[in-house]
Amino acid sequence: RGRKKRQASSPDTGKGPYNASRASFRNRDTSLTVEANNIAALQAIFARADDEGFFIELMAMEPIQGEGSPGSCITREFYDEARRLTKEHGSLLLVDSIQAGLRGQGCLSVVDYRGFQDAEEPDLETWSKALNAGQFPLSVIGLSERAADLYIVGVYGNTMTTNPRALETAIAVLHRVTP
């Protein structure tokens, strides 16, 4: 829409439909895919970026699979290596907790999962589904200090505007599930 410097591109699962219907996604080969928990493959992707001189802007991971492989989880070792590599290369780490947040482990964030409590937070983490009680359109993004410093107010248009009723619902959900 002319607001972003570069449009985000989806992973392999959405590539076909986007290529067919959106000209800006055609002939793009900018997504790199690594199998969850394959640390050697993850390291190889970042090494390839170094060797070929390209920058990985963002690594996205879903800590507990929803649709693709329900219940499959990333390991702490994989998460830690992803965090290390993204920091070392200046990339952002995004954790997609849209489906799993609250439901997958009974807590909101990946850094609250059992065995992950002392893990370093991601740069961005997203939530929706359980947080909005299945009632109102609401997605939430949590930003680390580094990611917040990169955020430019006004660039993201209506995508990032508020919905007061949905926010009230999320607050009520959080109050109900917070010990």
Listing of model-derived features with the role each one plays in the protein:
Residues 1-57, 77:
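PLP-dependent aspartate aminotransferase-fold enzymes
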Residues 8-16, 76-81, 108-122, 143-149:
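A glycine- and small-aliphatic-rich helix-loop capping segment at beta-alpha/alpha-beta transitions
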Residues 33-34, 61, 127:
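Conserved beta-strand positions
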Residues 85-89:
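Helix C-cap/helix->beta junction micro-motif
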